[in-house]
Amino acid sequence: MTASYLHTMLRVTDPAKSRAFYEALGMEFRRESPIVRNGELEATLYFFGFPSQEEELELTFNHDGSTYELGTGYGHIAIGVDVLDATLASLAEQGIEPERAPYQVREGGSWLCFVRDPDGYRIEIIGRG
């Protein structure tokens, strides 16, 4: 049996803010897919990914005005970036600041920090360089 990881879906409340956030992390917008049922626009799916990878992040916007709770089961998504400081500067332009200053888990290890996306999802950002 051959299997592969395809995507993760997160519900969002403001697609434009979410798009700016994930593009600041280096993701590219790939496509938009409206979901129409019984002639009504029910949801719009927005797909993002990194240029060198097939896996995607699907952001779903439900047009019925639903509100969401993050729940206790969600932990975080981890994203590796080439230059942590540059990524954080780009996010700061959107008013997004790290929960605390970047730190190393172990001496000589990668620098990392956590931020929240526009819907409150926790995102770990790990600097590769």
Task: Describe the function of each predicted region.
Residues 14-16, 82-85:
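Helix N-cap motif at beta-to-alpha junctions
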Residues 42, 73, 109:
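Exposed loop/turn and edge beta-strand positions of beta-sandwich/beta-sheet ligand-binding modules
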Residues 5-7, 72-77:
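Eukaryotic phosphotyrosine signaling hubs
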Residues 32-35, 47, 79, 88-129:
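Vicinal oxygen chelate
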